[in-house]
Curated annotation (Swiss-Prot):
Its EC number is 2.3.2.29. Functions in the N-end rule pathway of protein degradation where it conjugates Leu from its aminoacyl-tRNA to the N-termini of proteins containing an N-terminal aspartate or glutamate. InterPro entries: Acyl_CoA_acyltransferase, Asp_Glu_LeuTrfase, N-end_Aminoacyl_Trfase, N-end_Aminoacyl_Trfase_C, N-end_Aminoacyl_Trfase_N. It is an enzyme of class 2 (transferase). Belongs to the R-transferase family. Bpt subfamily. GO terms for molecular function: arginyl-tRNA--protein transferase activity; leucyl-tRNA--protein transferase activity. Its main location: cytoplasm. This is Aspartate/glutamate leucyltransferase. Keywords: Acyltransferase, Cytoplasm, Transferase. One of its GO terms (biological process) is ubiquitin-dependent protein catabolic process via the N-end rule pathway. It catalyses: N-terminal L-glutamyl-[protein] + L-leucyl-tRNA(Leu) = N-terminal L-leucyl-L-glutamyl-[protein] + tRNA(Leu) + H(+); N-terminal L-aspartyl-[protein] + L-leucyl-tRNA(Leu) = N-terminal L-leucyl-L-aspartyl-[protein] + tRNA(Leu) + H(+).
Length: 234
């Protein structure tokens, strides 16, 4: 069984940054053959690593530290007035926890979401292979959180459970339901669920100053940022 001291890491060649124009990025990732158990996954999350499919990675770019890992302490979190309105607006939804397995209904919603929201990104056009490798080929304790209005599926939040929290992997939702702010609601729900489960943190990935797609993460306060391997509350 692998441990942090025996892990082997690799680095990708420089490639165009997905978040900041005119920047080159390098990604450090764990050897895909490594046996990542729950404790090791937790430690990697604490060090700022993220999971995508079977890959655990962290930005390691020359001359750039723009990607800052963030997490929310669940016991200290308080909703803003806007977030409270979003919470109440979606009180008519039912929530169900599912395991990570293929469902045609889930994939159809994913296709609609990517096609409507991310035509300018490398996830478009959405394919079955991409969907499965991204969200289903996990060796972790992964949950698919379904949000429904009556029988209609409106959103899916994919999240991993670690020993110290939840790690929000991806959320996709009905692009015709903008007024519900389902992306916000999914984060609020995970925060509430983690608190009820006595899990101290919700990991949200990377906050990137100057990147509109990532700026929303600092709307959840208090928030902790990883700076020089130490978590600091801002």
């Amino acid at each position: 069984m692998s441990n942090l001291r025996t892990l082997v890491f690799y680095a990708t060649p420089e490639h165009p940054c997905s978040y900041l124009d005119d920047r080159l990025a390098t990604t450090m990732f764990v050897d895909p053959k490594a046996d990542i158990n729950l404790d090791l996954y937790t430690r990697l999350s604490q060090l700022g690593f993220r999971r995508s499919g079977n890959h655990y990675y962290k930005p390691r770019c020359n001359g750039c530290n723009a990607c800052i890992a963030v997490r929310i302490p669940t016991e200290e979190f308080n909703r803003t007035r806007s977030q409270e309105r979003t919470w109440k607006r979606n009180s008519d939804l039912t929530v169900r926890l599912r395991s990570a397995q293929f469902e045609q209904e889930h994939f159809a919603l994913y296709q609609r979401y990517i096609s409507a929201r991310h035509q300018d990104g490398d996830m478009y056009p959405p394919t079955l292979d991409q969907y499965e490798s991204f969200l289903l080929e996990a060796r972790s304790e992964t949950l698919f959180i379904e949000f429904r209005k009556d029988s209609k599926l409106l959103a899916i939040a994919v999240t991993d459970r670690t020993t110290d929290g939840l790690s929000a992997i991806y959320t996709f939702f009905d692009p015709n339901e903008d007024k519900r702010a389902l992306g916000v609601y999914a984060i609020l729900w995970q925060l509430q669920f983690a608190r009820e489960q006595r899990l101290p943190y919700l990991y949200l990935g990377y906050w990137i100053r100057g990147c509109r797609k990532m700026s929303y993460k600092t709307n959840y306060r208090p928030i902790q940022v990883l700076v020089r391997d130490s978590w600091i509350t801002i």
